[in-house]
């Protein structure tokens, strides 16, 4: 069953917010009226995950300019997120919120949980200001994602959201610069 055009299920989780308050709670109420990206990854202290999170950190300011809040999500605790971010040069520059899904609520609701392992699949969800999933992508364990492509998808989703009678064809972003 597709999750496209489905409203996200209410949630409340603990989180680590680097460089600010350290530990916070985040719920569905916190994202109302905002564009959000939920960026699921299997685990902290791994190999592909820090490359993706660092790439996302490089784009964080650009996403903020679009009014998009980034949430990385794994089934690790918020304490583990903090320890990893503070001990890894690769992800030291992260400033977006790292959600702890140690109770598996988000992974279950977004249908990305690998129950036998207690880990989330590598998946990305773009959620509009009404809490509706506009796009998602899931890849196998060894395939990293590209923040530049995610940025293009977010811009396309925002464009279609604001212009419901229009579409975004392939290479849409590069076409608008011609």
Where do the model's predicted regions map?
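Chalcogenol-based redox active-site neighborhoods
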Residues: 1-176
